[in-house]
């Protein structure tokens, strides 16, 4: 049995507020929860996330494992030209 008068008040319909807008309700010990980010405005969940690649790590990984370039705008390096035959090989 729970001890009386030691537990916080439970609010079964606490409002979750993001940017002044009620985005959902949940149960909590406070009547309102103010959040900066939630799934409705986070880039990962909205599909607008961009890969920030400041040091070329993603491209290096893609080249290493043969997956092409992570950025389609970046051209792949040109294939190396075949070495010229030396004069000794052409005389034979």
UniProtKB/Swiss-Prot annotation:
One of its GO terms (cellular component) is ribosome. One of its GO terms (biological process) is translation. GO terms for molecular function: rRNA binding; structural constituent of ribosome. InterPro entries: Ribosomal_bL28/bL31-like_sf, Ribosomal_bL31, Ribosomal_bL31_A, Ribosomal_bL31_sf. Residues 70-80 have a biased composition (Low complexity). Residues 66-92 are annotated as: Disordered. SUPFAM superfamilies: L28p-like (SSF143800). Keywords: Ribonucleoprotein, Ribosomal protein, RNA-binding, rRNA-binding. Pfam families: Ribosomal_L31. It comes from the Bacteria. PROSITE patterns: RIBOSOMAL_L31 (PS01143). Part of the 50S ribosomal subunit. Binds the 23S rRNA. PANTHER family: 50S RIBOSOMAL PROTEIN L31, CHLOROPLASTIC, LARGE RIBOSOMAL SUBUNIT PROTEIN BL31C. Belongs to the bacterial ribosomal protein bL31 family. Type A subfamily. HAMAP family: Ribosomal_bL31_1 (MF_00501). This is Large ribosomal subunit protein bL31. It comes from Synechococcus sp. (strain RCC307).
């Amino acid at each position: 049995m729970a001890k009386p008068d030691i537990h916080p008040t439970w609010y079964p319909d606490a409002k979750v507020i993001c940017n002044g807008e009620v985005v959902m309700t949940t149960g909590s010990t406070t009547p309102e929860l103010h959040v900066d980010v939630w799934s409705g405005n986070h880039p990962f969940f909205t599909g607008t996330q961009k890969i920030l690649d400041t040091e070329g790590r993603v491209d290096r990984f893609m080249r290493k494992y043969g997956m092409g370039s992570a950025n389609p705008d970046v051209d792949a390096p040109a294939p190396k030209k075949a070495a010229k035959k030396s004069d000794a090989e052409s005389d034979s």
